[in-house]
From Swiss-Prot:
EC number: 7.1.1.-
Keywords, alphabetical: Chloroplast, Membrane, NAD, NADP, Plastid, Plastoquinone, Quinone, Thylakoid, Translocase, Transmembrane, Transmembrane helix, Transport
PANTHER family linked to this entry: NADH-UBIQUINONE OXIDOREDUCTASE CHAIN 5
Family named by the database record: Belongs to the complex I subunit 5 family.
Gene Ontology biological process terms from the UniProt entry: ATP synthesis coupled electron transport; electron transport coupled proton transport
Function recorded in the entry: NDH shuttles electrons from NAD(P)H:plastoquinone, via FMN and iron-sulfur (Fe-S) centers, to quinones in the photosynthetic chain and possibly in a chloroplast respiratory chain. The immediate electron acceptor for the enzyme in this species is believed to be plastoquinone. Couples the redox reaction to proton translocation, and thus conserves the redox energy in a proton gradient.
Membrane topology: Multi-pass membrane protein
Record's catalysed reaction(s): a plastoquinone + NADH + (n+1) H(+)(in) = a plastoquinol + NAD(+) + n H(+)(out); a plastoquinone + NADPH + (n+1) H(+)(in) = a plastoquinol + NADP(+) + n H(+)(out)
Residue stretches spanning the membrane: 9-29, 40-60, 89-109, 125-145, 147-167, 185-205, 219-239, 258-278, 283-303, 327-347, 354-374, 396-416, 425-445, 549-569, 605-625, 721-741
Cell compartment(s), UniProt: Plastid, Chloroplast thylakoid membrane
Source domain of life: Eukaryota
Name listed for the protein in its UniProt record: NAD(P)H-quinone oxidoreductase subunit 5, chloroplastic
Name of encoding gene: ndhF
Provenance organism: Cichorium intybus
Disulfide bonds: none
Length: 741
């Protein structure tokens, strides 16, 4: 066991050769490197698989022995200061390592096919491997300095991956927005680290916790300053995990490739903030009011993320706000002191959300055959629907991920979310009401995404998706409002496929199409897919290749069974509690973690009932027109409600506007913060040019004009110069003679 721990330092560096070799190959042998580019996917998966095996070995030893191992190298600068680097292996490290590697491997396998036609294929895998290295280095860090170094590397990688298609203006703005927003949190994190070093004199976690606890117990610190430093540390987690009010970058991060969205939202960037708070939990629990502040930010994010997801039309943005809300649940659990529940939900949510994002990528991939390589169309749920018969495997996997996030047993997220909901009642009834209500909203918007994507009919054939006018096939629009039906009852799908017979050769001729608006041009037949040397023409979506389906099927297994890790059947079978021992759980200090089946059944029935109610409302509003409700005129009974109809419509429209416009938070930041900063910059520019520069420039101008005046007096004649010279000499001699009399 000791040997395994001694060589654990290699874990963060194993994926690093891939970006280094890709960069070296492109510099020295660019043609050969590009022609053999598919082999880099295998190397990336292979190296990350080795890391996964090492992480699993460490996790098994953690479960059996519950030990903590730390190895440190000292870098002595002088006698008064030494900087130490090392690695820390504990339950939190092993959990995060397995999470990063398992999800990362699935995303890499998926990306090999998803990015196969992209000219940035090599750059993509270089970024991905460096991303894995940065995150693994973060979770194995033994002190705050290492945390900050790898924290910044994670931010740089996310900036590069979000702006992967940097020639698209929208993607370029999105990565800049993510980078600037995280700068705010990272600056707070740096100040907090320096503040605690000033208090304790150490960056090492073990020394930091011990010294700080002694100072607190002896009342030898300024609590106001300590609280400020803790809030600054927490600001880094707020930005990284997209907590209110620094959450605005998360939906725009969807401009990157879909595999990146899966990795960011499941196991890397957004998980970094949760990891930081969990790592520093011994520091936070001894500071008055900071835990309450963490739980407050968490519950606000829970509800805000759910409300903003209600009316999103972009499938990836809807899932992004779902991630924001679920991260709020984790932060709420950490703030309540429910350490086990927070990490349990981090695990279950990671696999379920990775499944949903890879499933959405499969949907987007199939829709591109109809609407082209434009994210505004291929990700728009308005144009989807009726995909069940075209992509059955993707549909079933997406349904399982949806039900898991809704909290339907026995899927993964049910077990972890149910623990957080129960703990919220113990902590605060108000927080409990908000958390349980948001569980219903989660079921509603997730079921809404599923219904709009897979049920009904393929709307792209029935809509003018130019962006100016839409003619929906459904009698209920996206938000449940009345919509116009198709006016042409004899409409046929074949008319969409018929072209001018005389121009038929040009229909299937090779043409250049713009891919994803990122200036990636590809020569291909219109609506044709190359597959094993054969060319097939599609007028409908098609199921993804096996390379993309395999990771989805593996994530289905995780979604089905990973939740059972946290079920405490008996003291010997409670794997998660053994894994996290010793762990911090303020709400259940004296609990032996054994499950009370009566209490569990009662709470589970309540939570499942709320989730079922949200699912029912979604089916009621978004079920296709040829449903039982439509045939029985069930909806018409609610249309004729009399004067109250106007009031209900106003409420409905207000909720829709709030959700679709992102709660007006982005607009507020744009109008007041961004505009204010620009005005301040303009004022600083004016002050610098007109006042600061005016002083030396004014002296220079005065010297110039004075020289011109003196020059004009002389006139440019030598006789005049001699006359003035002797006149001045005579005057000075007279003055000298007068004063010496």
């Amino acid at each position: 066991m000791e040997q395994t721990y001694q060589y654990a330092w290699i874990i963060p560096f194993l994926p690093l050769p891939v970006p280094m070799l890709i960069g070296l190959g492109l510099l020295l042998f660019p043609t050969a490197t590009k022609s053999l580019r598919r082999m880099w996917a295998f190397q990336s998966v292979f190296l990350l698989s080795i890391v996964m095996i090492l992480s699993m070995n460490l996790s098994i030893q953690q479960i059996n022995s519950s030990s903590v191992y730390q190895y440190v190298w000292s870098w002595i600068i002088n006698n008064d200061f030494s900087l130490e680097f090392g690695y820390l292996i504990d339950p939190l490290t092993s959990i995060m390592s397995i999470l990063i590697t398992t999800v990362g491997i699935m995303v890499l396998i998926y990306s090999d096919n998803y990015m196969s036609h992209d000219h940035g294929y090599l750059r993509f895998f270089a970024y991905m491997s460096f991303f894995s290295t940065s995150m693994l280095g973060l979770v194995t860090s033994s002190n705050l300095i290492q945390i900050y170094i790898f924290w910044e590397l994670v931010g740089v990688c996310s900036y590069l991956l979000i702006g992967f298609w940097f020639t698209r203006p929208v993607a370029a703005k999105a990565c800049q927005k993510a980078f600037v927003t995280n700068r705010v949190g990272d600056f707070g994190l740096l100040l907090g680290i320096l503040g605690f070093y000033w208090i304790t004199g150490s960056f090492e976690f073990s020394d930091l916790f011990q010294i700080f606890n002694n100072l607190i117990s002896n009342n030898e610190v300024n609590f106001l300053f300590v609280t400020l430093c803790a809030i600054l540390l927490f600001a880094g987690a707020i930005a990284k995990s997209a907590q209110f009010p620094l959450h605005v970058w998360l939906p725009d991060a969807m401009e990157g490739p879909t595999p990146i969205s899966a990795l960011i939202h499941a196991a890397t960037m957004v998980a970094a903030g949760i990891f930081l708070v969990a790592r520093l939990m011994p520091l936070f629990i001894v500071i008055p009011h900071i835990m309450n502040f963490i739980s407050l930010i968490g519950i606000i994010t829970v509800f805000l993320g759910a409300t903003l997801a209600l009316a999103q039309k972009d499938i990836k943005r809807g899932l992004a706000y779902s991630t924001m809300s679920q991260l709020g649940y984790m932060m709420l659990a950490l703030g309540m002191g429910s350490y086990r529940s927070a990490l349990f939900h981090l695990i279950t949510h990671a696999y379920s959300k990775a499944l949903l994002f890879l499933g959405s990528g499969s949907v987007i991939h199939s829709m591109e055959t109809l609407v082209g390589y434009c994210p505004k169309k291929s990700q728009n749920m308005v144009l989807m629907g009726g995909l069940t018969k075209h992509v059955p495997i993707t549909k079933n996997s997406f349904l399982l991920g949806t039900l898991s996030l809704c909290g339907i047993p026995p899927l993964a997220c049910f077990w972890s979310k149910d623990e957080i909901l129960n703990d919220s009642w113990l902590y605060s009834p108000i927080f409990g009401i908000i958390a349980w209500s948001t569980a219903g909203l989660t079921a509603f918007y997730m079921c809404r995404i599923y219904l709009l994507t897979f049920e009904g009919h393929l709307n792209v054939h029935f809509q003018n998706y130019s962006g100016k006018s839409n003619t929906p096939f459904y009698s209920i629009s996206l938000w449940g409002k009345e919509g116009s039906k198709i006016s042409n009852k004899n409409f046929r799908l074949l008319t969409l496929l018929k072209m001018n017979k005389n121009a038929r050769p040009s229909f299937f001729s090779n043409r250049v199409y713009k891919i994803d608006e990122n200036v990636r041009n590809r020569i291909q037949p219109f609506l044709s897919i190359p597959h094993f040397g054969n060319t097939k023409t599609y007028s409908y979506p098609y199921e993804s290749d096996n390379t993309m389906l395999f990771p989805i099927l593996v994530l289905i297994l995780f979604t089905l069974f990973v939740g059972f890790l946290g079920i405490p059947f008996t003291q010997d079978v409670d794997i998660l509690s053994k894994w996290l021992t010793p762990s911090i759980n303020l709400l259940h200090k004296n609990s032996n973690n054994l499950i009370d089946w009566y209490e569990f059944s009662k709470d589970a029935f309540f939570s499942v009932s709320i989730a079922s109610f949200g699912i029912f409302i979604a089916f009621f509003l978004y079920k296709p027109v040829y449903s039982t409700f439509q045939n029985l005129d069930f909806l018409n009974a609610f249309v004729k409600m009399g004067p109250n109809r106007i009031f209900y419509d106003k409420i409905k429209n207000a909720i829709y506007d709030w959700s679709y416009n992102r709660g007006y938070i982005d607009a507020f930041y744009g109008r007041f913060l961004t505009a204010g900063m620009r005005k301040l910059a303009d004022f600083a520019h004016f002050f610098d040019r007109r006042i600061i520069d005016a002083i030396p420039n004014g002296v220079g101008l005065m010297s110039f004009f004075l020289a011109e005046v003196i020059k004009s007096v002389g006139g440019g004649r030598i006789s005049s110069y001699l006359f003035f010279y002797f006149s001045y000499v005579a005057i000075f001699l007279l003055i000298y003679y007068f004063f010496n009399l």
